[in-house]
Curated annotation (Swiss-Prot):
Residues 61-253 form the B30.2/SPRY domain. Component of an E3 ubiquitin ligase complex composed of hiw and Fsn. Belongs to the FBXO45/Fsn family. The gene is Fsn. It comes from Drosophila persimilis. Required in the presynaptic motoneuron to down-regulate the levels of wnd and restrain synaptic terminal growth at the neuromuscular junction (NMJ). Pfam families: F-box-like, SPRY. GO terms for biological process: negative regulation of gene expression; negative regulation of synaptic assembly at neuromuscular junction; neuromuscular synaptic transmission; positive regulation of protein catabolic process; proteasome-mediated ubiquitin-dependent protein catabolic process; protein ubiquitination; synapse assembly involved in innervation. It is found in: Synapse. InterPro entries: B30.2/SPRY (IPR001870), B30.2/SPRY_sf (IPR043136), ConA-like_dom_sf (IPR013320), F-box-like_dom_sf (IPR036047), F-box_dom (IPR001810), FBXO45-Fsn/SPSB_families (IPR050672), SPRY_dom (IPR003877), SPRY_FBXO45 (IPR035784). This is F-box/SPRY domain-containing protein 1. Gene3D superfamilies: 1.20.1280.50, 2.60.120.920.
Length: 255
C-alpha cells in the first residue's frame, strides 16, 4: 500500500514538473531513466494534454482536420510542422488554427507557402486538404528554401524551377524545373481531385523519392533522385479566398 501511494505521489509530482518544462527539456528528460521515458511515452498523458492545449486552440484539437494525429503529442508535433507564417507569399495568411492557409483574392498572382520544418533525413508523411476551389492551377509538393513563393500571373509556381517539385491537381501533371514530367497518377482516365479530399504526401529522404496517396491508395512514386537538401512541404495556389490545410503525420506506415 505504501509503495502504491509513493508511486502515485511520484506520478503526480512528475506531472506537475513536466508541465512547466519546455518541449526541448521534455525530450532530454525522456533520456534520463526508464521511468521517465515510460511516463513521457504516454502520448495522451496530462503532460502532453497541457502542452497541446497551451499551444493549439481547443476547438482544433477536437476537429476532423486533426483526425490523422489522434494523440495530444502527435497533434502538438503536427502544429510545430504546420505552415510557416514567415515563409509564405505576402498574399497568403495563416488562419488562427495554425494549420490552414488562406489566399487573398489578388488578381494576376500565384502564391505559395512552405511549412515550418524541412527534412533531409528519414521518411515523412503529411496530409494536404484543399478546402476551396482549385482554380486553373493548384500544386502540392516540396521545395527548398530557395524556391520562389510569389510570381505574376496564374502559373504552376511550385515546380517552375530546379528548387521545387509539384503535382498539379487540376491537370494531373508532375512539374519540375519548369517542365511537365508526365501525367500522374499513371492510370487511364485518372480521376481528378475533388475539393476536400485528403492527399497524403510521402517524402523518403533515404531513397530520395516523393510519392502520393489518395483515399488510402498508393499512387506510385512521383519523383526520384531528389537532392541532398532540406526539403519543405509546399503548395502554390491561384484562386482567391481558397484555403489549404496541412497536417504532419510523422513516419509513414508501410503497407
Amino acid at each position: 500500500m505504501v509503495d502504491r501511494v509513493a508511486a502515485l505521489c511520484n506520478y503526480n509530482v512528475l506531472e506537475v514538473v513536466f508541465s512547466y518544462l519546455d518541449l526541448n527539456d521534455l525530450g532530454r528528460c525522456s533520456q534520463v531513466c526508464k521511468s521517465w521515458f515510460h511516463f513521457l511515452n504516454d502520448e495522451n498523458s496530462d503532460v502532453w494534454r497541457f502542452h497541446c492545449l497551451n499551444k493549439l486552440p481547443k476547438e482544433v484539437t477536437k476537429s476532423e482536420l486533426l483526425s490523422p494525429v489522434p494523440t495530444y503529442k502527435t497533434k502538438l508535433r503536427a502544429f510545430f510542422h504546420s505552415w510557416n507564417p514567415s515563409d509564405c507569399s505576402r498574399n497568403v495568411y495563416i488562419k488562427p488554427n495554425g494549420f490552414t492557409l488562406h489566399r487573398n483574392p489578388v488578381a494576376q498572382s500565384t502564391d505559395a507557402a512552405r511549412a515550418k520544418i524541412g527534412f533531409r533525413h528519414g521518411r515523412h508523411a503529411w496530409e494536404v486538404i484543399w478546402e476551396g476551389p482549385l482554380g486553373t492551377v493548384a500544386v502540392i509538393g516540396i521545395s527548398t528554401k530557395e524556391a520562389a513563393l510569389q510570381c505574376h500571373g496564374y502559373v504552376a509556381l511550385l515546380g517552375s524551377d530546379d528548387q521545387s517539385w509539384g503535382w498539379n491537381l487540376v491537370e494531373n501533371h508532375l512539374l519540375h524545373n519548369g517542365d511537365m514530367q508526365g501525367g500522374y497518377p499513371l492510370l487511364n482516365n485518372a480521376p481528378k481531385y475533388q475539393v476536400g479530399e485528403r492527399i497524403r504526401v510521402i517524402l523518403d529522404c533515404d531513397d530520395n523519392t516523393l510519392s502520393f496517396e489518395k483515399n488510402y491508395e498508393f499512387l506510385g512514386v512521383a519523383f526520384r533522385g531528389l537532392p541532398d537538401k532540406k526539403l519543405f512541404p509546399t503548395v502554390s495556389a491561384v484562386y482567391g479566398n481558397t484555403e489549404v490545410s496541412m497536417v504532419y503525420c510523422g513516419t509513414p506506415l508501410d503497407g
